[in-house]
Each structure stands twice: as structure tokens, then as C-alpha cells.
């Protein structure tokens, strides 16, 4: 699937989930497609943020076809499908972990005083094999959200304040800028890892520059 088709498919999925969230009968605020800057100026494109009396719900939408396979702690999940009678599998980053990084960016803006929940929605209802409460199809999303209770519900004023804080901190980046920022961070990370490996190969501590010593068959910094 080329980038334009993938982008269009993603937008279709996000619009579908937004239409279900708009049906929420409780007092709420819904923010779709918000970009925030997190740690190290990394941009986070968040599909949906639903703010209501029982908390803040950060929702990642995946409009993937094929059978979805994965566990909560896996780094990657897999979607498996057939092409011309042959099974094909493609891995993708665990969306729960992806969404939890978005939550960190949100907490950077609003603090830690409010309950925040992570949900992942597969619009094709093809994640039945993942037995997690916060992974579902769009039809059951609001039902699951309504099951969550908290000791002290958010007031109307708090809901509106949270919404305004998030909107005031929105980073106005194009999709291309967002992708480029991610690429820059990944490039810096790989470059840093390369520098560390090069230092270790020279038996030099990458942190302090001291010569590494061999202790119990391992290289260790004398400091």
C-alpha cells in the first residue's frame, strides 16, 4: 500500500471512530488529530482525546485489514492476511505502547492530577484474538469507556479547562513535518547507538571516556 492510500485509509478509520465518539450522551469534549510536542521536542500525533466525567481517554485508531495478533508487552504486533491464496504477515509497532507515549506528552501539558486511559480501536473488528479490555472495535468503544468508574468525577469546568490546555499547546505541523521529526529522532538515536558501539569497540567508556576494564568476562568502567 503506497503512502497516499495508507493515509487515506487511516483518515477513513479516524473519521469512523470519531463518529462513534460523537454519540457520547454524557457531557464531554472531543479532540481529534491533535499534535503535541513531548520530551526532546518529539511530535505526537494523537488520533482522539475524549474528555468526560470519568476521565481522559486517549484513543489510537488502526484501520488495518487481516487478523491482528499481539500481546500487551510485545514490542511489535502482527497482521496476517492472504494475497492470491498465500498468507502474508506484516509487523507493526505495538499501538498500546505507541499510545502510552502519547499519554506522556499529554501529562506534560496537563500534569498528573487527572485519570488518563489508553484505548486502541481496530475499525475492521479484526482483533478478537487480543483479549484486552482496552483493545476493541468502534461499536463497543463507548460501552467499555462507560464501564470505567473513578472516585472523584471530573467537573464540567475541569473538562473544559483540560480541553483548552491541550488546544493551547497544539503544535501546528503538517503531516510531512510530523513524519520528518520522527525520522530526525530515529536518525539521532541510531547515530548515538553507533557512537556507543564504536567507543566500546575501542574499550573506552562512552559516558566518561575512561578506559574500560575486563571484570568477570565483561567490560566495565572503573568509575
Predicted stretch roles:
Residues 76-78:
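A short, glycine/acidic-enriched catalytic loop
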Residues 1-44, 51-56, 62-70, 81-223:
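Surface-exposed interaction regions that form or flank ligand-binding interfaces
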